[in-house]
Amino acid sequence: MLGKTAGSLYWMARYLERSENNARLIDAGFRIALTRSNTAEAEWRSVLVTAGQDGRFRQAHGEDYSSQRVVDFMLRDPANPSSILSVIKQARDNARTARTYLTREVWEAVNTSWMTLGALLKRQVRKDDLPDALAAIRRQNGQVRGALTGTMLRNDGFHFAQLGTFLERADNIARILDVKYYLLLPSVAHIGGSIDNVQWETILRSVSAHRAYRWLYGAEISALKIAEFLILYRQLPRSLAFCCERVEEHLGQIQRGYAEETEAGRMAAALCRDRLSAPIQAIFDGGLHEYLSGFLGATGALARQVERDYRFVE
């Protein structure tokens, strides 16, 4: 497969995952804003920081972190290349470039998503309509994901797409935890004790892990358990451990298909071995913020190495 085609499949999947992750962040911010009007603007800024969009937002709107302005910026602002509308278009453009490597079902799902969400976000989304709009974004992404896993051959094209998905997801989870890490520190909440219900629920809901956490831990809420669940629990599809294992798995499949070991493959193996083998208490003892910063640095370096090894840009 040409590097350009592999890169298009990889970025198609990354952009689709990014649009869904941002929709979940907006939903979490919206829930907090409904219950805590006195701190709503601080929470909306936190959403922008997590999504990596705060700098661009402040350039355009200064310190006005009102709900409607932030939501509109993240959903549909044409001047924001990371808005959901923008990344859906980029996903569709990449899918079109690699169209001959996609099944008809995958292409139609991506194209339908672009048309449906383009129509939905053509106008400003009112506050009362926001939950339905965010649900539609998640639903469209689910249809693409279903078509991808249900109809694609398990060849290099599939593995490049999955690699993009899980690298993007790992980056997103680590950013959420890094922005919110102060909530999990002993200075704010005793390790093993309870922390603010609205805030921890926001963390879990923003990664679709609220109900799964309840199934596993019941009503017991603690900083240590939340961090352990989202970092080390390998059965959770949005934990760092799960994402890293999938990255290593799909890179391994690509390497076997090409009969060639790469630096990216070695880096992925090291990421799983070095970053996910310590127990959660050791991670806290060493500094949660430092751990997450190191993880983000490692995944960023891995993503850049993937692009070099497989010549996404000639």
Question: Where is each model-derived feature located?
Answer:
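Alpha-helical transmembrane segments and their helix-helix packing motifs
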Residues: 1-314
